[in-house]
Structure formats: C-alpha cells, structure tokens
C-alpha cells in the first residue's frame, strides 16, 4: 500500500532496465564486435530521442530530478550502476517498515474485536433482563401513568377551586367584617364590600351556563351579605351624623368615603340625607333662635352672642341682621356640605346612577320612561335648603311681624328692596326653586303690598288738598313731600340688584304707579280749577319739580320724557297766551287780524289795504299811539305776568317766543302798509302826474319792526 506514496512515481520513472541504464550511462557504449556503425547510431539516436522527448514540464519527472539533486550524487559510472539497487533497497526497506506497522495495527484490531464481542454479550444480557423487567412492571407503569394523569387533573381542579373560592366566595372573617355591627367600618370593611360587589357582577358569567344552580346560590349569598353590609354602613353613617361637627374644617375622610359607597343604594342614601337634614334643621333653628335672643329655646344663655333683638335699633337694621345671619349660615352650610358630598368629584353621582340603574323598578320601567339624571349641585342646594327650613320659618315670622307693624312708606319700600336683594343672593346660592327663595319672594310681596297700602292711604288723606292751587302757583306741599319720598325710594332702588336687571324701568313702573302717578294726577286735578295762564304756570312748576327729581335716574327715563313733553305742551300754551296779550295790549290786534289774510305779493291784496277800516287815518293814529304807550313797559308787564313761573329760563323763553311771533306779525303789518303807500303813489302819478298826495300810512304809523324787536328783546 505504501508504494503508492508521493515519492514512488519519480523513483519508478528512474528505474531502468540493466541493459538500458548501462547503455545510457556508458560513455562509449557496448564494445562488441557485433555492433555496427549503423546499429549503434540507430540505438543511440533512439536513446537520445527518448531523452529529448521527455518533457521537463512533467511534474513527476521534475520531482524525480529534484530527489536526485537532493541526494548529491555525482554523475559517475559507480553511482549510475548503484542507483537502481539503492532505490530498490529503499523501496524494500520502506515496505518492510509498513508491514511491521500493519502488524501492530492488526494486533490492536484483534483486541478491539474481542472487546466488542464482550460488549455485545453484556448488551444482550442486559437487554434480556430489561425485557423481563419491562414485562413484569408494565402494569405498574400503566397504573402509575394513570395516577399521574389523575394527579395533574386533581391539581388543576384544586387550583381552579382555590381560584374560584378566592374570587367568588367570602371567607368567614370577611363575612363577619362585612355584616357584624361589632366590627368597625374600616378599610377591611370597604375592601370586603368591594369584593362582594365584584362577585355579584361576575356571577353573571356563571348564570350564563346551562346549570345555573351554582351561580344562583352564590348570587343569593352575596346579595344577602351585601344588603347586610349596606345596612351596617347606613346605621354607622347615622351614628356619625349625630356627632358630626360641620364647623370643623377637617371633616373625616371616613364619612366621605362611606357616603360615596352608600350612594350605590339610593334609597338608603336618601334616608341618610333625610336624617341629616332633620338634624341640621334642628341645629340651625336653635342657632338662629340663640342669635336672635341670646339664649336657646331651653333658656340657656350664651354670653358670647349679642342678641339681634337688642342690638338692632330700627326695623330695617333688625331685618337686615336676620337676613345677614341666614345668608351666612346658608353659605357656611353649603361650604361644609360641599366638602362632605362633592369634594371627591362626581363619585357620589356615579354611585347613585349605578344604584338607580340596578333598582328593580328601574328594570321594569316602561321603554319610553326615563329617570332623571342625578345632579350633585342640585342635590346639594336642596339639602342646604332643607337644613335652613327651620330657621327660615322663624325668619319669616319675625319679618312679617316687622312689615305688618310698619307705618312708614319709605321704610316699607326699603324693606322690600332689602328682601329682594337677599332673594337674588339666595337664588344664586341654592337655586330659584328653594324654600329660602320662596320665603324671600313672599316677604317681598308682603312688603310691597304694605308699601302700596301705605302709599294709597297717604294719597287718600290728601284728597282734601287736591282742591285749589296755591296763590303763588308753586308745587303743593304734598307733591314736594311725595317727590322727596320718591327720591329716597329711587336711591334705594338704584343701589339694589333689581336696577341692573334686564328691564329695571318696567320693574319700577309699579312703584311709580303708587308713589308718583297719584300725586301728579292730584296736581292736574287742582290745575283744572284754575284759569289760563295760571293753570299752565302751576302745571309747569309741578312738572319741573318732578323732572328735577327724576332726571338723575336712568330707570325712569320714560317718565322724565313724558314730563318734558307735558312741560313743552304747557309752555306752548303760555307762549300763545303771552302772544295774544302782546297783540291786545299793543292795540294792534284788530289791525293784525285785518291784514292777516292779505298777501304782499298780490297787487289786489295790497290794493285792498287802503279800503280797510282799521287802516283809516284816525284808527291808524290811535293804534300807533296805543303801541307807543305799550312798548316801554311791555317786557316788564310780561315778566310780571310770569313771575310765579319758578323756572326763570323757561319764563324768558316764553317771553322771547311770544315776542318773536308778535314781531313777525308786526313785520307783516309794516310791509303791507309800505306796499299800500307805494301802490297809492304809483296810481296818483299815473292819473295826473302830480306827486303831491295825502298823508301816507308810514307817516301815520311810523314804528318800524327793528324798533319793536329792540324794545321787546
């Protein structure tokens, strides 16, 4: 096998036959007589050709040459002769070593074969024993496998049962903590209650199975425990309410948590609120009575309290102090209840909504029927209102007594206005549909009724004064008093919340109907018995006084505008009266009237002037003379006529307007007379050319309109 190694091929290629090698390596060739020149040449040529034909690029040949080169042989005849032998000897030695080594390998293989035989015997023996053991333990292993399977199933069932019991069953300790009144309402109670509620919800899954016995049983047990738990919580909250101090700024978190949980039972929650409201109503009633009298209903005095009945020095202060106490108590009650019921967000509202949806009557309600959504703010307002109801009853009795015993008109209105202010305040605090607001509305109505009654009684007592105007035509005393009273009322109303409402003018109209209109009607009735212009002067004096009173208030602008209109109407009457007086006293009345219908632009009308009786020389002289007598004292006489008019500016305006109208009429008279003179002059010239004529109208009536305006200005 080893002769095929990498060194073998070059060795084989160099091994030549003895004949060939001797011939090749011999420098002279064979020396036999039989060799001829031709044969020797042929053999040598063949050898040379063979050598030359050998490719030096052949790998095996090159390796053979490389091996020869490594041996360091000299190219001598001795070495050439021994080369084959040495090579063969080396091959034989190598083969011998290989055979020796293979002998060792064969010996080792024999030992391995012996060992393998022993192993096969042991394996067969063990296999026989195993088959025998397996045959004897097969039934036992089957039973063990079944037992292991059963064990796994039982363990799975145990785990499921344990999980089921943990999730759906309350332990006895948990049931005791939930239902026994001897156990406290603490974190454990609320934890167990939450677990019971979760069990109740999850029982719906069990009820979905075909066999509902387990689900119904657990549901019944949990429901019973839940009911006992909520009853325990309900009674605990009632006990806490009895000792609860709302004035304490830090109300316990336990009671707030209990209320949030109890809200899931709306009926129990409402019963708690009713109980709480009754207790707070009694407490606040006692507190209000103590604030009024300084002692409780049982007669126990409180030295720290200043009794309102003793401190208040007038009815308005008395009512104001009672209303202020009620407002302060309502605000304090609301703030405390906000901490108690709303400080934790809308959890109570959510709980009540959940409880309502779970109630039986909710489930059987008609399809179209919807239950109102719980509003915590509205519920809080209602609770505050109920807490204050006892104090409100006492307040209402006391205020009604004050209103009924009051005999002052202004005080009655101030009381009504004060009550209206607190009505608006309570409406924002506890809502418009509350006992507080209803009581304030009733008291306000009662105060306004008393105000109207007193105002009407006052007007009735003044009926005898509504007969004749005062000699100096000034506003009567009853009007002055009424306007002072009205001014006080309007100032009170202006500071109230009502004046900033949507339509304060309409709201105040009812007050004006009682405190203003009757007195103005009385003045008008008095003026009807007077003669012009005294009637107008008296009415203007009354109207101006009323306008002065009303002008400072925006919510009576309509009344002020009506008064101003009436002043203008009476002023117009005074202007007419003064204008007629100017015409009569100046002596020009008949002349103005005669020329009134004539137009200066019409020649025919101008021609008629000379034919009028009023412009005849004698009549015209008398009119001119009377006018001259009138003008020096005209303004003084006119001012004297209006001396009772208290508004001097208005009197001057009346005289100016009357004088202006008189001057306009005089200008018309002057223009007509001048036109008549011109027309007469033209006629004379046309007839005879003689410019001399009788005395002209201007000569008979020399006054000019400019002079009149100066004298009457």
Swiss-Prot record:
GO terms for biological process: intra-Golgi vesicle-mediated transport; protein transport. It is a peripheral membrane protein. The keyword Transmembrane helix does not apply. Residues 1-40 are annotated as: Disordered. InterPro entries: COG6, COG6_C, COG6_N. Keywords: Golgi apparatus, Membrane, Protein transport, Transport. Disulfide bonds: none annotated. The keyword DNA repair does not apply. GO terms for cellular component: Golgi membrane; Golgi transport complex. It is found in: Golgi apparatus membrane. Acts as a component of the peripheral membrane COG complex that is involved in intra-Golgi protein trafficking. COG is located at the cis-Golgi, and regulates tethering of retrograde intra-Golgi vesicles and possibly a number of other membrane trafficking events. PANTHER family: COMPONENT OF OLIGOMERIC GOLGI COMPLEX 6, CONSERVED OLIGOMERIC GOLGI COMPLEX SUBUNIT 6. Belongs to the COG6 family. This is Conserved oligomeric Golgi complex subunit 6. It comes from Neurospora crassa (strain ATCC 24698 / 74-OR23-1A / CBS 708.71 / DSM 1257 / FGSC 987). The gene is cog-6.
